[in-house]
Amino acid sequence: MFRKTADRLPVFLILSLTLVDFILYFTVENFWVLAVYFALTVVPKGCICSWNHHHQHTKTFRFTPLNRLLELVYALHTGVTTNLWLLHHVFGHHHNYLDQTIDESRWKRKDGTLMSEWEYTLNVAFTAYYRGYLVGKKHPHHYRTHVIYTALAVALVLALTIYHPLQATMLFTIPMVVGLFITAWVTYDHHAGLSETEDHFKASFNNINPVFNLVTGNLGYHTAHHYRQGVHWSELPALHDTIKDEIPREMYKTSFWEVFNNSFFLKLFGLSR
């Protein structure tokens, strides 16, 4: 059923969180309970954005219907529907990221200056579906699938909202909007400020923090991901090891995730130092 056994645990956890969402949808009417739940799940649901990204590169299941169902689940968490990132990210950004005049996730303004983090986030999030549409003109089959399943996702959320407006808003609508912005926001650190136009080894920042890579599916091995975008997320560390001597030291960045890089958290997450 699964293409890679490594996908079993993350899919189980994501589906479990989705089940909790629906249990609360049908059983909880208190705004404050829903608000606290939303606050507690912002970070976990934000991490789901990376797993949706991985799925767009290498499908999780062998059977298309299962992939479509999983994509509907991802849409409810991230606001990114079936094939949007396939068009925008896989067919778009990965082919164009060295050229900031056409990159779908471009971080340069038209005058060539660097966008701020928030300007970039707003720009990429607000234009995501439009830029997906532009890429879709070259891939009409994939775009038709995107339109069909986007309509299905919208219809589902609309039905949920009609039946239980408060619960649907707190559990689905707001998290979907926030998820889309998180998806855009986390990509800023991948390339922003790197004006490399030829060398892929100098065009991506990497974050090799073990906790970050545990919860995002090795998204921090970003040079390797662009070097061979079809490689499954579980195989990126091994691929990184084969090319790490080609990656300049300045292509490695640290982040707030370093706070977890101590013996307590590493043991908690089952990681070795």
Label each region the model flagged.
Residues 42-55, 172-198, 218:
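Transmembrane alpha-helical segments that form the membrane-embedded catalytic/substrate-channel core
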